[in-house]
């Protein structure tokens, strides 16, 4: 009773019209929609039967129902189908493929007529083609029969391709100035032959100027703030550093050589250079006459005392340190000249053997 009471007015008077379900209009329109769809499908099959040849040669246009029927004039049905198609198109784009109905798409050339993939289109309700009525075009995305698998629409594919291409161009463009910079640095970098020649010349000029490798390292620290060890300078002269480090150290050493050569003339500059590092004493050259006097004294006394060295230095007008070093070097030379294991004769024995004639031993005959 509660159910039937909803359809009975309160004044208990029956309406003149028969009772109808509230959704009867939509049910009627839905029925009409199904009937029209069946009719369209039937006409499509008749078109296939009348046209001979492959279905690819069909030139029918899309079915655009424009008659003022319940199906075409129903705005709420068109709106529902529009929403349904929009949701479906969004789902198709998200899933990466398109569900399709094979609907013939008219083309400009008859020989290219095919079941081409087309996106869903909706005509505006007030467009001239629809005569003020909303018309639905059931031409959703489909696949071609004789073409390869369709990819994304060019509107979706080309931006990705263009972005990838532009990204590749952006990745390639920074490399061009970098490569030019590398070429420029390679042109400025000296070759291995140049480094070898410079290292040889540097060593010769350093020895000629009287500087040790440690002196050069300390001088570089005083001039440029970078102190280099004696090992680094030695490895540079021996070409044992890496090519990169050789290229970095070459201009510093070259500049040091130029400043040293320019400051060699005046004594004040020599003192300044000596203050930069421990300056090696120059090699003392002894005259021939002085050297002969030292040799005679060495033959008499190979190891003189400190007093004898001082007296000899005053006599020969030499420094005491020079005389002492000369005797040390002379003794080392004598040791190298004497074989190992043979007793070293004294100088007196040598002179006595040279002055006295050799001894002759007489043979005595046996007593008979």
UniProtKB/Swiss-Prot annotation:
It comes from the Eukaryota. Residues 1-16, 105-134 have a biased composition (Polar residues). GO terms for molecular function: DNA-binding transcription factor activity, RNA polymerase II-specific; RNA polymerase II cis-regulatory region sequence-specific DNA binding. GO terms for cellular component: nucleus. GO terms for biological process: brain development; cell differentiation; regulation of transcription by RNA polymerase II. It holds the Pfam family Homeodomain. Predominantly expressed in the embryonic and adult central nervous system. Residues 79-88, 155-170 have a biased composition (Basic and acidic residues). Residues 187-261 form the POU-specific domain. Residues 279-338 bind DNA. Residues 1-28, 69-88, 100-134, 147-193 are annotated as: Disordered. Keywords: Developmental protein, Differentiation, DNA-binding, Homeobox, Neurogenesis, Nucleus, Transcription, Transcription regulation. It is found in: Nucleus. Its main location: nucleus. InterPro entries: HD, Homeobox_CS, Homeodomain-like_sf, Lambda_DNA-bd_dom_sf, POU, POU_dom, POU_domain_TF, TF_POU_3. Belongs to the POU transcription factor family. Class-3 subfamily. Transcription factor that may play important roles in patterning the embryonic brain. Could directly respond to the reception of the sonic hedgehog (shh) signal. PANTHER family: POU DOMAIN, POU DOMAIN, CLASS 3, TRANSCRIPTION FACTOR 1. This is POU domain, class 3, transcription factor 1. The lineage of its organism: Eukaryota, Metazoa, Chordata, Craniata, Vertebrata. The gene is pou3f1.
């Amino acid at each position: 009773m509660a159910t039937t009471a909803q359809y009975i007015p309160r004044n208990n008077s029956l309406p003149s019209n028969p009772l109808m379900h509230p959704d009867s209009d939509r049910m009627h329109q839905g029925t009409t929609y199904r009937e029209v769809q069946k009719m369209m499908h039937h006409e499509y099959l008749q078109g296939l039967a009348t046209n001979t040849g492959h279905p690819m040669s069909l030139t029918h246009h899309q079915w655009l129902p424009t008659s003022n029927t319940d199906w075409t004039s129903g705005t709420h049905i068109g709106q529902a189908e529009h929403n349904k198609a929009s949701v479906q198109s969004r789902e198709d784009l998200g899933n990466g493929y398109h569900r399709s109905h094979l609907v013939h798409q008219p083309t400009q050339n008859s020989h290219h007529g095919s079941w081409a993939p087309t996106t869903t289109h909706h005509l505006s309700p007030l467009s001239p083609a629809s005569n003020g009525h909303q018309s639905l075009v059931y031409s959703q995305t489909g696949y071609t029969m004789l073409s390869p698998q369709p990819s994304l629409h060019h509107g979706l594919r080309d931006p990705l391709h263009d972005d990838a291409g532009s990204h590749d161009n952006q990745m390639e463009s920074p490399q061009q100035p970098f490569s030019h910079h590398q070429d420029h640095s390679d042109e400025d970098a000296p070759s291995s032959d140049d480094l070898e020649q410079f290292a040889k010349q540097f060593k010769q000029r350093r020895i000629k100027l009287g500087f040790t490798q440690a002196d050069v390292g300390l001088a570089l620290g005083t001039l440029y703030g970078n102190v280099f060890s004696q090992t680094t300078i030695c490895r540079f002269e021996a070409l044992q550093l890496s090519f990169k480090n050789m290229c970095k150290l070459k201009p510093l050493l070259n500049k040091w050589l130029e400043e040293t050569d320019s400051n060699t003339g005046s004594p004040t500059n020599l003192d300044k250079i000596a203050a930069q590092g421990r300056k090696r004493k120059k090699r003392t050259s002894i005259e021939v006459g002085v050297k002969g006097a030292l040799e005679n004294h060495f033959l008499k006394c190979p190891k003189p005392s400190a007093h004898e060295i001082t007296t000899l230095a005053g006599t020969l007008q030499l420094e005491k340190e020079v005389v002492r070093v000369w005797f040390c070097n002379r003794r080392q030379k004598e040791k190298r000249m004497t074989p190992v294991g043979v007793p070293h004769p004294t100088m007196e024995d040598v002179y006595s053997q040279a002055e006295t004639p050799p001894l002759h031993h007489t043979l005595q005959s046996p007593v008979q």
